[in-house]
Every structure is written in C-alpha cells, then in structure tokens.
Amino acid sequence: MTMRQCAIYGKGGIGKSTTTQNLVAALAEMGKKVMIVGCDPKADSTRLILHAKAQNTIMEMAAEVGSVEDLELEDVLQIGYGDVRCAESGGPEPGVGCAGRGVITAINFLEEEGAYEEDLDFVFYDVLGDVVCGGFAMPIRENKAQEIYIVCSGEMMAMYAANNISKGIVKYAKSGKVRLGGLICNSRKTDREDELIIALAEKLGTQMIHFVPRDNIVQRAEIRRMTVIEYDPTCQQANEYRQLAQKIVNNTKKVVPTPCTMDELESLLMEFGIMEEEDTSIIGKTAAEENAA
C-alpha cells in the first residue's frame, strides 16, 4: 500500500486532536502502520496515544541542544498505542516568532531523518485551528499531505471555518495534488446537524465522510489520557471511530472543493434555522433614533 498523507483541519476547539487520535487508534487496531505529526504549539496531538500530558516537541528539543541538526530521530519520535509513531512540531513561546515555521522545520527534519521510510500506511498531520497561513498550510502547500479532512459541527463558526479551509485547499490544489477527502461531523447535538453537514458537503462538492455522535465516554477516556478505542473497545463510540477509519481507508472521493460565497453559506444557515434573516432596517441606527421611530 502506498503511504497516504492526510491533514486534519477545523475550527479551534472542534475536537480535531481527539478525533484524529481515536481515528488513528482504530487504524492501528486494524493493523495499519501510522504516524501522527502534531502541527500545533499546544503539543496535544499525541497525548491520548502516549498517555502523556504533552510530548516534548521538536522545536523545544532543538532549542535545548542548539539546533534541529543536532537532534536524532529517536529523540523526537515516540511509540504509543498500537505502535503508532508520534512527533510534535511545537513552536516558539507565545508572542514570539511564527509557530508555522516550527511546522516547516519539524516536517523537513522528519523527512531528512527517514521517519517517512518506515513502511507506513498513513501519516496524519493534526493542524492548528482554522489557520491556513503559510506555516500551518505547509502540510498542504508543500504537497506533504494530499488528503484533507475537515472536522466540523452544525455550529455556525465551525461551518465558516470549513468553508475558509476549503478556500485554502483550492489555492494549493492549483499547483499540487492536495484534495479534500470529506467533512467529519463531530456532533455538538445541534438541530438537524447531520442534514446540515450533508448539505454543506454538497455545496463544497464533497461528502460527509462520517457523523461522530456526541458521547461522554470520549471525555471519560480523555481524563485517563486514553482513546476510546483503548479505554473501552466494546462501546458504541469505539465502533463509530472504527467506522470512520474504515471509510477513510476506502475513500476514493477526493476533490478540489467548491467553496461557498458568504451569501450562499448564510442562506444555508437560514434554511436550517441556524441564522435568522437580517433586519436591514435597523443597521446604523442609534438607540435614540430607534426610540424616536
């Protein structure tokens, strides 16, 4: 099997890291060889696989020894549940420098040190928030990741983020092979959520690859720094992640997305009752003017 490189994007706080690690645990359980590369300065992309608070990052270790050239692969790569290989890029202190540079430096280091030559089936990049700036777009800009999955929900801001990320994919698809593999709905239990994300996926020219229901067992597993797959392999939520993993294994629908205009997106949100039609008659009016009317 040719190694598949996938990047997971989505709004900050949507559950990307949790979804990615549970998905990866399910792939490992299926016998797939997987590596996770955390592309977020928080360095929380591997904690459930490693049962750790946060893995030491490539950028932290490079600062300690002098430069990234002084590091060895075994210094930065840890093995976790199901023999999953884990690396965290890290970044500078908050307010200092560009964290995206850390992603670029880390991925280049892993490539040069042969981390990708280990007979891998999948590499997953867990990428910071909905930022598609130069550094964080690096996994797609440099043709590292060729498959993008966007984690979203039926909440308005999560859908805005999915649309913005799709715009970024279009930009880089013109010069490379990057494609959108689908939307993963990480449910927030909003009204008609699955229908809404299916409709959004249709607008974007893609698919909702799986609807992950909300279940408190995810939080119970997280408190123990474990994936649901490892914590309670017999529960229904573990089966949801297995289904997601199988759908990604079988996925052949990878597209250049067709992002919505803001008007189209707002029309969709109004159609599903997420957003009310704007009352244009009140725009620009002061309280005094409204009271006088």
UniProtKB/Swiss-Prot annotation:
SUPFAM superfamilies: P-loop containing nucleoside triphosphate hydrolases (SSF52540). [4Fe-4S] cluster binds at residues 98, 133. The reversible ADP-ribosylation of Arg-101 inactivates the nitrogenase reductase and regulates nitrogenase activity. It holds the Pfam family Fer4_NifH. InterPro entries: NifH/chlL_CS, NifH/frxC, Nitrogenase_Fe_NifH, P-loop_NTPase. It is an enzyme of class 1 (oxidoreductase). It catalyses: N2 + 8 reduced [2Fe-2S]-[ferredoxin] + 16 ATP + 16 H2O = H2 + 8 oxidized [2Fe-2S]-[ferredoxin] + 2 NH4(+) + 16 ADP + 16 phosphate + 6 H(+). One of its GO terms (biological process) is nitrogen fixation. ATP binds at residues 10-17. Belongs to the NifH/BchL/ChlL family. The key enzymatic reactions in nitrogen fixation are catalyzed by the nitrogenase complex, which has 2 components: the iron protein and the molybdenum-iron protein. This is Nitrogenase iron protein. The gene is nifH.
